[in-house]
Design a protein with these regions (language model features):
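Helix-coil boundary/capping segments in enzymes
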Residues: 1-36, 128, 135-137, 168-169, ...
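Active-site gating/metal-coordination segments in enzymes
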Residues: 10-15, 20-103, 154, 160-164
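Active-site beta-loop-alpha junctions enriched in small/polar residues
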Residues: 19-23, 78, 109-111, 136-139, ...
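Histidine/acidic-residue-rich catalytic or RNA/ligand-binding cores of hydrolases
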Residues: 26, 113-121, 141-149, 165-175, ...
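Catalytic pocket-lining loop regions of alpha/beta-barrel enzymes
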Residues: 94, 98-180
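Divalent metal-coordination and catalytic microenvironments
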Residues: 97, 155, 192, 233, ...
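Short acidic/histidine-rich active-site segments
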Residues: 105, 158-160, 183-206, 233
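Mid-to-C-terminal alpha-helical segments outside catalytic/metal-binding sites
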Residues: 213-249
Length: 249
């Protein structure tokens, strides 16, 4: 993490993440998230935003702060359920957001539980307006999208090039539908390509694959073919991320 921050210093903006993945990644009986009081866990997250991220990701046996500060809080939920552990992580995220002004980025399983996520965040003092719900293309319900956007949240469509889930044309058509209804300020685009199979450079020894550039070289041109204006494309790629991922002071 620190190596990445130093390597790209002065070359671009990298937003580091604090927080938790969905609950299934943690032991419900012995993990840090499960055993430590919510407000104490939140203090550790707040420190990663305000002071610097721990070099060892809080794996112990001591905390060593770095110069790199977190700029986004992550939490995650399961398919059609928010487990007790995930509710706790959402409470931690909301408390951290309230104290730091840092945005929340949510993993959703197949785009489910979006409304319930916002309920949990708001209940604990967080803001839907500073919350991004990711992987939403996997649940292609346009009116469900509208109900979430009407609460001020941002939706991220982040899986073009993953036809096993949804085809690019369907994702693009749903984006167009939302744009036609005035939601252009609440949509961001991305590539959920954190694993090796999503990074072309890691697969050169195997064969040809698309990487992060697919968003700009294939998906954005598809939006243009569907008559999405350059202004709206710029909003989704530049302005909206800049706004929602800014830290409120």
């Amino acid at each position: 993490m620190l190596k990445v921050a130093k390597a790209y210093e002065g070359k671009g903006n990298i937003v580091m993440t604090t927080g938790f993945q969905k609950g299934g990644n943690y032991c419900p009986n012995t993990s840090f998230l499960a055993t430590v009081d919510t407000n104490i866990v939140a203090k550790y997250m707040i420190a990663e935003v305000a002071e610097g991220m721990d070099l060892n990701s809080y794996n112990g046996p001591y905390v060593e702060r770095t110069i790199a500060k977190a700029g986004v809080i992550k939490a995650g939920t399961s398919y059609r359920i928010i487990t007790k552990l995930e509710q706790k992580a959402l409470a931690v995220a909301a408390i951290t957001q309230k104290e730091t002004g840092c945005p929340i980025s949510m993993h959703t399983d197949f785009g489910t539980m979006g409304s319930e996520i916002l309920d949990e965040i708001e209940k604990n003092g967080g803001k839907s307006e500073k919350t991004v719900l990711c992987h939403m293309q996997r649940n292609p319900d346009r009116y469900y999208y509208s109900s979430i956007l009407d609460r001020g949240a941002t939706i991220c469509f982040d899986e073009p090039n993953k036809a096993a889930y949804r085809p690019d044309t369907e994702i693009a058509e749903n984006i167009c539908w939302l744009l036609d209804r005035g939601y252009e300020n609440q949509i961001v685009l991305g590539m959920d390509a954190g694993r090796v199979e999503g990074l072309a450079s890691y697969r050169e020894s195997v064969g040809r694959a698309n990487g992060l550039e697919y968003l700009l070289t294939r998906f954005v041109p598809l939006l243009r073919k569907m008559s999405v204006s350059e202004e709206k494309i710029h909003k989704m790629l530049v302005e909206n991320p800049s706004n929602v991922f800014s830290i409120e002071v």
